[in-house]
Regions:
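Short, acidic, metal-binding catalytic loop of nucleotide-sugar glycosyltransferases
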Residues: 35-44
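Short aromatic/hydrophobic "clamp" motif used to bind/position activated sugar donors
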Residues: 101
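A recurrent flexible, glycine/aromatic-enriched loop bordering the glycosyltransferase active site
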Residues: 129, 137, 143-169
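Glycine-rich, basic loop-to-helix element that forms the pyrophosphate-binding segment
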Residues: 79-96
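Conserved donor NDP-sugar-binding/catalytic core segment of glycosyltransferases
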Residues: 113-145
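Cell-envelope/extracellular polymer assembly enzymes that use nucleotide-activated donors
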Residues: 15-18, 46, 191
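Acidic donor-binding loop at a coil-to-helix junction in glycosyltransferase catalytic cores
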Residues: 185-192
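A conserved acidic beta->alpha catalytic loop
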Residues: 43, 49-61
Length: 274
């Protein structure tokens, strides 16, 4: 599928999309996520960055955006360094100006067509929210790339087929991330997804996982074991990867990962991208 091809011309949207990033002290990663935002083809958008990092870090983010000429970025400091991840995400929602919200993690990357395609899909299905069912996953330091399918070839349906970090939704004041307890610091996006899924129509975005790259780099919220378990349980087969090799070769041009890159399916190495 051509990701830029509209599902239906009537399903185009011009609503502002607010991309919401929470970050602290991962400057190199945050810069790449900002660049990913800057390269989006969807025109009416903003990037709201909420950080409890120190002033030099905040200044570095602002300077990077200004020097690169990237418009529509706001860097906000909550005034406290003791807030949970869930509380910081809620601050980003409150600060958003758009009618559509999109989670924009500082260590994941989106294809330039991601916002346009997901917003169009959500509108076409008259949904309150949308999540990908599949995405790319890059594992360091080995440097291998996989295509993760949360639906597990269709065996998972409903909530279990959705990738929580890929949220896009219409603004809705009913929904907030947990701000206390263990879920407020890790897994808050899964809890939020459960709440949204139970309350509004959700449009799963299937088969377009090349539009989103999930990266393990050693400083993620979740452990290496978690990321490897995601790969072991949900990696697409080598045959599926070979079928979509041309799509992968084109998509990988937009992602900041080293080449050559080994593409690995559930049976092992499939091919190499240069």
């Amino acid at each position: 599928m051509n990701p830029s091809a509209p599902e239906n011309a009537a399903n185009e949207t011009t609503a502002m999309i607010s991309c919401l990033m929470v970050t602290k002290d991962r400057l190199a990663l945050a810069k790449l996520a900002i660049r990913s935002y800057a390269e989006q083809t969807y025109p009416d958008r903003e990037l709201v960055i909420v950080t409890d990092g120190e002033e030099p870090f905040r200044s570095a983010l602002t300077s990077y955006a200004d020097e690169a000429g990237i418009a529509g970025i706001r860097v906000l400091h909550p005034g406290s360094s003791r807030l949970t991840l869930g509380a910081l995400r809620n601050i980003s929602i409150q600060a958003a100006r758009g009618d559509i919200l999109c989670q924009w993690d500082d260590d994941d990357y989106s294809h330039p067509e991601r916002l346009a395609v997901q917003a169009r899909h959500m509108l076409a299905h008259a949904a309150g929210a949308s999540f990908f069912t599949d995405h790319l996953q890059y594992i360091e330091p080995e440097g291998f790339l996989s295509w993760i399918d949360w639906s597990m070839d269709g065996r998972n349906q409903g909530l279990r087929q959705l990738a929580p970090g890929t949220l896009m939704m219409h603004r809705d004041a009913r929904f907030r991330y947990p701000e206390s307890g263990p879920d407020a610091r890790r897994g808050e996006d899964w809890v939020f997804m459960e709440t949204v899924y139970a309350a509004v129509p959700v449009a799963p975005l299937k088969g377009l996982g090349h539009l989103y790259l999930y990266r393990y780099h050693g400083r993620n919220t979740h452990s290496r074991e978690h990321h490897m378990n995601v790969w072991a349980d949900r990696a697409r087969s080598n045959a599926q990867l070979l079928h979509d090799a041309a799509t992968l070769r084109d998509a990988i041009r937009h992602y900041p990962i080293p080449r050559p890159c080994s593409v690995v399916g559930r049976e092992g190495p499939a091919f190499v991208l240069n």
